[in-house]
């Protein structure tokens, strides 16, 4: 029984998520999203990778500000240095080094961990992901 806020920029995805979870969703881009209240945790699995690096930085800062002290923030990106259009969609890939640039200026982060994992989807075993775990200072 967790209370969650469903956020996506796609009307169709918002409808599907609301139907699946049985609650309303917020249809908003992450750049425009204005968190209401505060959160114990944020789960952004492959959610922010379609933003430019500059926008990722500002969104991460905004979302970190909405976390309770001691709150956790998970996000993932395709692993690499690429930024641009791929297969008709925009992607920002990150490495451990470019992640540090995204996190620059976040003074309320107590702990940062990252792990590289392989994609588990069929036919994509060679693709890598950068998984990032942040904890807000208590």
How would you label these PLM feature ranges?
Residues 70-77:
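Conserved beta-strand signature within the Rossmann-like core of class I S-adenosyl-L-methionine
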Residues 91-107:
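Short alpha-helix
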Residues 40-55:
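A short SAM/SAH-binding and catalytic strip from SAM-dependent methyltransferases
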Residues 119-138:
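Core SAM-dependent methyltransferase catalytic element
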Residues 1-33:
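Class I SAM-dependent methyltransferase SAM/SAH-binding core
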Residues 108-120:
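Conserved S-adenosyl-L-methionine
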């Amino acid at each position: 029984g967790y209370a969650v806020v469903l956020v996506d920029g796609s009307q169709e995805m918002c409808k599907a998520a609301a139907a699946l979870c049985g609650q309303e969703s917020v249809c908003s881009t992450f750049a425009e999203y204005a968190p209401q209240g505060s959160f114990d945790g944020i789960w952004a699995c492959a959610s922010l990778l379609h933003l430019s690096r500059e926008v990722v930085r500002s969104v991460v800062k905004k979302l970190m500000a909405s976390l309770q002290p001691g709150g956790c923030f998970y996000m993932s990106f395709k692993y690499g240095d690429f930024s641009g259009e791929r297969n008709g969609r925009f992607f920002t890939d990150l490495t451990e080094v470019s992640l540090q640039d995204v996190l620059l200026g976040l003074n309320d982060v107590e702990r940062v961990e990252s792990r590289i994992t392989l994609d588990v989807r069929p036919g994509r075993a060679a693709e890598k992901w950068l998984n990032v775990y942040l904890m807000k200072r208590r």
